[in-house]
Amino acid sequence: ASFTTTWSIDLHRPDPENTRYFPGREFKATTDHVVIYPYPVPYRCLYSRNIDNLFMAGRNISVTHVALGTVRVMRTTGMMGEVVGMAASLCKKYQATPRDIYHYYLEELKSLMQKGVNKKGLPNNQRYNEGGRLNQIPKVK
């Protein structure tokens, strides 16, 4: 895994009331939130399957619409950016494609991810949605 997502499954859909009153022009959405355990996201989600030299770090990540409901938030997309930056440095170092990093240099990427990019010596006092670490039991459908 290259990063972990902790956000609940957060799916938006048109509000049925607005569908009735504004057919085809729904402007207000409702959401379904499902609490999840944090889960790891594979590095392979961060590069294109059919364009050799294309990384995707953000809401264009290669996932299903349900998985996008958990990875589209800012903290998680920031972690994607860190991993893609590390992988891009290896692409330059080895004149390799993102897919090559997975096949030939994954251990080196893991080593970079283990070190991290954070500034050393700063307190780790940031709070975020801790997903499955809450006292709620995630729903599995």
What name fits each language-model region?
Residues 1-141:
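Flavin (FAD/FMN)-binding glycine-rich loop and adjacent Rossmann-like elements that form
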